[in-house]
């Protein structure tokens, strides 16, 4: 499995709140955000990890060069990175796309926080969907709302016969900016399991002058790609200084139950002032 990390954001809100290091090097539970993802990806059969970082500071570039040269946690890492400063996360994805055209991959932003064991379950489910041909992608979703501008996920009521088959994870019908009636069961978690088909959609979105990952996700639906929803108990972002403590507390606690593949109305979530795009 290939993995890709978008680490090209400015992290301006963290800087304004007194965190001086670039976001990819912010530590959660004693580990830099980018290192945490590398560790998790290596634990889930990473064939290659590609990262895009910006050129606003040399620190992230230098850190990734060191890992490429010296390895990480006692072993060499199949890591490559590029340095680009881009106007949106979709543009960052586009810069990575040349490395993602020949096999399935999982993409996320550098500050996405989830439980390791849930991610392992997600990867197993994504691989199973690829093996049986039930989907063109699997998106991580959550019913925990901690985002000022969440992207709501609407499932299809009944998976089309012969497409999703017996798969326990429902197909996604659309991605919406608003859910005034509270009927959408989940929001996007910013974890994207995709096949090379998605690159065609990305290229179309770029040609049409679109930006933001949410518009790319809607483009996938417009192009007829079959996307399954995999529920995580929580997915958090590190956008503010207080989010570091929140993430560490989340990782310390254990869930009472694992979410199932059946989508139901959202649970009670705490709405923050984050505007991390999904």
Residue ranges and their predicted role:
Residues 20-35:
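Short catalytic helix/loop segments, enriched in acidic residues and glycine
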Residues 55, 108, 193-194, 239:
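A conserved hydrophobic position in a structured secondary element of the catalytic/binding core
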Residues 1-19, 225:
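N-terminal nucleotide-binding beta1-loop-alpha1 segment
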Residues 120-123, 167-236, 242-255:
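Catalytic-core segments of class I nucleotidyltransferases/pyrophosphorylases
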Residues 2-5, 13, 31-109, 113, ...:
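Conserved N-terminal catalytic core of the sugar/cofactor nucleotidyltransferase
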Residues 117-149:
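Conserved donor-nucleotide/metal-binding helix-loop-beta segment in metal-dependent transferases, i.e.
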């Amino acid at each position: 499995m290939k993995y890709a990390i978008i680490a090209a954001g400015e992290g301006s809100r963290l800087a304004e709140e007194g965190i001086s290091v670039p976001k990819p090097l912010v530590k959660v539970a004693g580990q830099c955000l980018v290192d945490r993802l590398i560790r998790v990806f290596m634990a889930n059969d990473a064939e290659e990890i590609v990262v895009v970082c910006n050129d606003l500071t040399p620190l992230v570039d230098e850190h990734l060069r060191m890992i490429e040269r010296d390895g990480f946690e006692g072993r060499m890492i199949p890591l490559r990175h590029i340095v680009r400063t881009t106007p949106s996360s979709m543009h960052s994805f586009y810069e990575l796309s040349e490395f993602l055209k020949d096999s399935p991959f999982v993409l996320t932003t550098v500050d996405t926080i989830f439980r390791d064991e849930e991610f392992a379950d997600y990867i197993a489910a994504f691989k199973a969907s690829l093996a049986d041909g039930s989907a063109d992608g699997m998106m991580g979703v959550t019913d925990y709302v901690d985002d000022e501008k969440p992207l709501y996920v609407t499932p299809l009521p009944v998976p089309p016969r012969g497409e999703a088959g017996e798969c326990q994870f429902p197909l996604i019908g659309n991605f919406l900016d608003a859910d005034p009636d509270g009927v959408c069961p989940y929001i996007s978690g910013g974890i994207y399991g995709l096949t090379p088909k998605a690159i065609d959609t990305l290229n179309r979105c770029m040609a049409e002058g679109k930006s933001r990952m949410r518009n790319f996700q809607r483009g996938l639906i417009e192009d007829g790609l079959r996307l399954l929803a995999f529920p995580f108990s929580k997915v958090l972002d590190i956008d503010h200084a207080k989010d570091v403590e929140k993430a560490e507390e989340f990782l310390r606690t254990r869930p009472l139950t694992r979410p199932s593949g059946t989508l139901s109305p959202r649970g009670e979530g705490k709405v923050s002032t984050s505007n991390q795009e999904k």
